[in-house]
Structures are given as structure tokens and as C-alpha cells.
Amino acid sequence: MDIKFLGNIISSLSPGQDFCIYGEVNDENDYNQNVVFTQDPSSKPTWAAVQAGQSPEQWVIVRGQRKGRLESCDWTQLEDVPLTAEKKTEWQTYRQALRDITNEPDPFNITWPTPPA
């Protein structure tokens, strides 16, 4: 889990709100893809529920990642951006695919769209 990603999650908290991050640590001492974020440490989900994709906390993580990806390409939608109409449309399509990511059935197996080149 990179620092920017963790920052996006933490920035979504209200002041004074508690949170915990659960997950396995890999050989590089980094969290794996199955990190569970919860704002209420007492509501730790069971591992079976996590593996079944029934973790609303995981959707918080996905939305945080999506927010970061959308913010990183906000510039492509500015009126005076030096992009062709075709490129701007490609970016609009990419951004819509990001917005639609919550339609995926499993928050642990997200297929992220590839940004335009």
C-alpha cells in the first residue's frame, strides 16, 4: 500500500474518527491487495466475509483509489487544455470507466481501466 493511497483513505475521515487497517504483510513488509479499512475497529469483518467480497470497507478503499486516479487527470478536462478533441474524448471515456468501477461485483478484484497514452 503506497503512502499516497493511504493518504487518500485517511483524508476521507472526519476529524477525531478512529480507523484500523487489517491485512497480511508480504515479504517486502508491504500490505497485500486484501487490505481491509474500517473506520470502526470494533466492527472488524470476518476473513470469510472479506474473501467473499462482502466488505463495505473495501469499497471505501476502491473509492479512494478511484478518487486519486480521477484527480490525477482532472487537467484533461480543462477548457484550455492542449489536447485534440479525440484525445479529450479518450480521457472522458477513461474517467467514466473510473466512475463506473463501483458496478463491479467484487471490490477485491477490480479491473482498472488503462489511461489513454
Give residue ranges: language-model regions.
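A preference for well-ordered globular domain cores
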Residues: M1-A117
